Amino acid sequence: GGEVLKTFGANTVLLAGADVLPSLASGAIDATEWIGPAADLGKGLHQAAQYYYNPGWHEPATILDCSIDMFEWEKLDDATRELITVASKAVNMEVLSFFQAVNDSSYQKLINEHGVQMRQLPDDVMNALGQRAGEVCSSIAAEDPVSQELFSHIVEFRSSILRWTNTSEKEYMRVRSLPFTYPSA
């Protein structure tokens, strides 16, 4: 996201987590991107920022990475590799599920208890960011053949998955938003 914002003239800085709130409060930085409502509330970012912009255009969700040097990975036996793979998937799913469960109550708390004003980025801004993100990623990918191959797979998969997403998740969320009600328990 930072590389994309730079192309629009933003000055981006990478800070240690402990330095984000003080830098925001002092005006050393004008804005920050952290994780999501629950983590943002826990970090106290509302103490220094009264506006909260959605959606997060640069990352679809909170995801954990587990990076292991390929040469070291290949030295591990199959059982250890499987253990690491299964444990990594389980932790990632647990963290994703946790944040999905607590983000709405944190979002409401930011609004109702701390007076944070929620704003939605307009479609023309989202389109410009998305277009520029593609250009930045393409430029970075062009620097070496491995990156280019990975990027082409990502673009191909994105095209494919968007067809299914429009039929499945997007429609599911549309239906969930219909005004039907459930009887009280």
Which residue stretches match the model-derived regions?
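N-terminal secretory/targeting leader peptides
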Residues: G1-A185
